[in-house]
Design a protein with these regions (language model features):
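A hydrophobic/aromatic-rich effector-binding and dimerization subdomain
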Residues: 4-7, 85-133
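Short beta-strand His + acidic residue motifs that chelate non-heme Fe in jelly-roll/DSBH
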Residues: 58-60, 76, 82-90
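Generic protein-terminus/edge-of-domain signal
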Residues: 1-67, 72
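A generic structural signal for short beta-strands and their flanking turns/coil linkers
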Residues: 55, 78-80, 94-96
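Conserved metal-binding segment of the jelly-roll/cupin
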Residues: 68-82, 99-100
């Protein structure tokens, strides 16, 4: 059975990567400011944007594998599972992560708009690719 990190609030992930809590509803991390940490397969109860120059190959997202090429953004939403199972290896990453609790947008116009953003959907298997302008 796979070990799954249950991210019930943004600071669960912060604690996992040895970062201090920022706010009860929001976590913003710059990976270059963190030490070594382990990979994780995550069950999200939060929204998130993972922004990296290069993602590791084989990131699972639901029953699929995410396709990333170069600088990309991966979006996650509550109820979704994704990541790379912990194999015991300590790693570093380059980039940013923003996680926020659904409570932050509950009852707001932004909550309604987010429902229409396809990149938070399980049906998406491609990252949002960033290209220089």
């Amino acid at each position: 059975m796979k070990k799954v990190l249950r991210i019930t609030n943004p600071n669960v992930y912060a604690a996992y990567v040895n970062a201090p809590p920022l706010h009860p509803l929001v976590c913003i991390l710059r990976y270059e400011e963190l030490g070594l940490f382990r990979r994780s397969l995550n069950l999200y109860s939060v929204y998130g944007l993972f922004i990296q120059d290069e993602f590791v190959k084989g990131i699972s997202y639901g029953m699929k594998t995410y396709e990333t090429h170069g600088p990309s953004i991966i979006a996650v939403a509550p109820g979704q599972i994704g990541g790379v199972e912990d194999n015991g290896e300590l790693i570093t990453r380059k980039g940013w992560v923003l996680l926020w609790s659904p409570e932050l947008t509950q009852g707001t116009a932004w909550e309604k708009k987010m429902e229409g953003y396809g990149f938070f959907s399980y049906y998406s298997s491609n990252s949002l690719e960033m290209t220089p302008t």
